[in-house]
């Protein structure tokens, strides 16, 4: 096993579940779960209709990159949502080839660190900068890619934003990624 795994801390949602085990919310108040972002509502009817219409395709794996139609639709949505005019990303807008659908944020965040680290570079370990508190996937991805995590405090005093001016030049020089929460 990779010895760097020993540096990982307990997953926050497991720790939170243990801390609140046995706690009973007051009977006169509605319980609001603010832990893991699990859906609490039924899917909209149009989603269920689309899923039912697609059941025949569940017997095979989809293309890793998703369908061209899906990637194109996501690219157009990005352009509308973030007002990305033609030429901002590339002439003609966001190319669908720059879009990669994933099953969840952890998968993509983890894979990103693996993709940007050159394992043949034997200099000082690269750094991955992240706010603290942080999403556990940032830390695990950095360690698994052979990088050193650099934690930037995001406290009430800083408006819960990391102070980017406080990042030392030598850290910036070695940083290969910066996760922003």
Residue ranges and their predicted role:
Residues 1-56, 172:
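Conserved N-terminal helix/loop that builds the PLP phosphate-binding region
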Residues 59-181:
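Conserved core of the PLP fold type I
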